[in-house]
Amino acid sequence: MTKNILFIMFDQLRFDYLSCAGHKTIKTPNIDRLASMGVRFSNCYVQSPVCGASRMSTYTGRYVSSHGAAWNNVPLKVGELTLGDHLRKAGMDSWLIGKTHMAVDTDGMERLGLANDSIIGARVSEAGFDIWLRDDGLWAYGPDGYYDEKKSPYNEYLKLKGYEGENPWADFANAGIDENNQMTSGWFMRHANIAANIEEEDSETPWLTSEAIKFISEKKEKPWLCHLSYIKPHWPYIVPAPYNEMYNASDVVDVIRSKSELEDTHPVFKAFMENTIGKTFSRNEVREVVIPAYMGLIKQCDDQMGRLFKYLKESGEMDNTIIVLTSDHGDYLGDHWLGEKDLFHAQSVKVPLIIYDPSHQADCTRGMVSDALVEAIDLTASFVEHASGEVPKHILEGKSLWPIVHGQQKELDRDFVVSEYDYSQQKMAKSLGVQPKDARLFMIADKEWKFMHAEGGFRPMLFDLKKDPHELNDLGADSAYQNIIDIMYQRLGRWSLRMSQRTTIDDEAIEKKQSSNSDVGIILGVYDDNEISDRSSSFYKGLAKGRYSSQN
């Protein structure tokens, strides 16, 4: 029987903020244990370092410029096949618990007459998943209304638990309380060391874990993929007790940045450094307050993994469940004078990836760390191959990871990885005077070099990953490296010319047409009927049916 897939995604979890990835102070024993049971990939890159675009690439198995949902709240167009579409065709259900950042193509839905409450319409509206529970986790509200107008399942849960008010997420889960009974909102990062005013078991991460356990206990009738998509450790940086006190400033690792990054800085890089987030995270006192909270959020996530894995083992599901654990992007946390994500340094574009396969084929790689060049879109290809035995390569642009997980090969057939970023909706594009069509960045990276191209007439960026693994010395303006830059531009050009839009017919069908002997009466390039067989010409010879033209 096909094994189930538990596809766990955290939001904004850095690749290097796990103890199994070498972090010096954070302890993540449960995720570490999963890594010891499976394969940990140390070179996994997302296809865009921002929530929405990254997730849409993961859910479609396609690059951002293929699916078009290039930033947050940009709709994924109707007709773009998703993970759920491929899996259901193979007989496997695809369920969501948590976050997707999916924006609905309302115009496309209306054009096709798809109702949101129909089965097909609901799936198209939710990145192809059937919904057990969806909550994107940001229930902010201000003078102009709510950031997200949808009804929050988490808020309804909190109300049932006795938390008061219209928006208990904002009042309790995202706020602490001081000695004067004043709210200390998580939106203001100076409050990051204050515990959220909520029972730990009622906070977002345990809530989603409980829903996952409930789902697994009930779904027994057919194989499933469950996308357990956690909201944390994404900002706001606030965590309930006791996690708010587990780490302090002494646990914060040294910042990765240099004064040289402030000199002759690439204009796009500089614009992001000079925005509010970059300036704030460049202050040491901010890092000393925020990062311990971020670590506390990760520790809570790890504890919930322990709870979830314990249930899987005790219920007998561990041996029947493939577990994949990853993130949608990272978090700069002040490295490179930046906050948030958005650009292509490792802190932002690389993510953790662990794959545990209980089958005997994976016994030879348990505990292995693979440095193969991996892209997040490889997950969809892997899931589809697991369910159906083959990957529709004319649609999916990723590569199956099972040959590595099963010890059949060390590397994928890939020379480089690609990531894209569209910053046209951000203020930085306006400050740079860049038109929306040109506010785009492209990354090409292998194990030695990382290259960034910026549309709009800017110079490239280049980093020597062997000599400069922290990416502190931009070589993009150094003529001594022009040959490397030329190679990277050749790669970018080759990638840009890929066949990405011919998704309704595969190469096998095309090749059959090339050699087809089917004769349906289309005769081209023939001067005389004697040049072809009687079988082909006989339909167009012989006595005429009658005379109707007066000209004959």
Residue ranges: model-predicted function:
Residues 464:
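Short, acidic/hydrophobic/Gly-rich beta-strand patch recurrent on exposed beta strands
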